[in-house]
Regions:
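A short SAM/SAH-binding and catalytic strip from SAM-dependent methyltransferases
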Residues: 166-189
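A short acidic, Gly/Pro-enriched loop at the edge of an enzyme's catalytic core
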Residues: 155-169
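Class I S-adenosyl-L-methionine
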Residues: 57-61, 217-263
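Class I SAM-dependent methyltransferase SAM/SAH-binding core
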Residues: 91-93, 97-157
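Class I SAM-dependent methyltransferase Rossmann-like catalytic core
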Residues: 15-88
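A generic alpha-to-beta junction signature in SAM-dependent methyltransferases
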Residues: 86, 110, 114, 202-205
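A short glycine-rich, Lys/Arg-flanked "PGG" loop and its adjoining helix->strand segment in the class I
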Residues: 183-205
Length: 263
């Protein structure tokens, strides 16, 4: 970890200053053959019925993008079921959006809730990491943002001026320092309590914050962070969504969810 602590701030600063970006990113080979069987097929058909947007994905996405969004949509659907279907997603803000390739899943939830025209935004701290294809996260994200009629920005959520949203998501936030270092960020970005507080501050009254964590240890740490938030604000109510499963696609870790409702 010593080298990560030493070099990450340097490389992150270089990426942020250079802001590597080039035009031309697109999906090269769209079109997916759906080959699910058994329980996976049953669950996929269920998602298609609830979220009609999924049908278009098979024509417009490549396989990797398709599988990614099916996985995330399955998790989002489980969050919705936990709310009893009462929560209207409305405007949406995703914090820590990476390359925003799962924006389609967010938009599908909005469309299903008659919120197709609602705002959808993503923010990512490390947006200029360069992939092997020569394009940056920003390049990928802007392509997906254009196709989903959403907005994407590179910046620090703790400092950026952002509008509040009815639904705010944190998918796999860094609650421990080691994963953050392994992903190339500096320890200066390790401020989990501040990020949770900020996410809740950006959640509208009557809205919800949805959080997904990897593994029981991260989930326990996440719950402690949320409890501290609630101890300072009597308008917050935490609900454990439990383990988020996916019968369609595989994910290498157990995923646990939390819903925080803001009165």
């Amino acid at each position: 970890m010593f080298l990560y602590r030493l070099l990450n701030p340097l490389f992150f600063t270089l990426r942020s200053r250079i802001r590597w970006s080039r035009s031309g990113y697109r999906i090269v080979h769209p079109g997916v053959h759906v080959s699910y069987t058994g329980e996976a097929r049953r669950r996929f058909d269920q998602l298609c019925m609830t979220y009609p947007e999924v049908q278009a994905w098979t024509r417009e996405m490549d396989e990797a993008l398709f599988r990614r969004n099916v996985l995330v949509l399955d998790w989002l659907d489980q969050f919705r079921c936990q709310t009893g279907g009462v929560h209207q997603s409305g405007s949406w803000l995703d914090i820590g959006s990476k390359n925003f390739d799962y924006a389609y899943a967010f938009r599908a939830v909005q469309v299903a809730g008659d919120d197709a025209s609602a705002a959808l935004s993503g923010i990512e701290l490390d947006g200029y990491r360069v992939y092997r294809d020569g394009y940056s996260r920003y390049d990928h994200a802007m392509y997906h943002a254009t196709r989903t009629e959403s907005t994407y920005m590179v910046g620090d959520v703790l400092e950026a001026k952002l509008p509040s949203a009815r639904t705010v998501t944190l998918l796999f936030p860094f609650v421990f320092a080691e994963p953050l270092l392994l992903w190339g960020l500096s320890l200066g970005a390790y401020r989990p309590q501040d990020i949770y507080d900020r996410a809740l501050a950006l959640t509208e009254s009557g809205g919800e914050l949805w959080i997904a964590n990897q593994g029981e240890r991260e989930a326990e740490a996440s719950y402690e962070l949320l409890q501290r938030c609630c101890n300072r604000n009597g308008e917050l109510e935490i609900s454990k969504a439990g383990r988020l499963t996916c019968e369609i696609e595989e994910y290498p870790a157990d995923v646990y969810g939390f819903i925080v409702r803001k009165k």
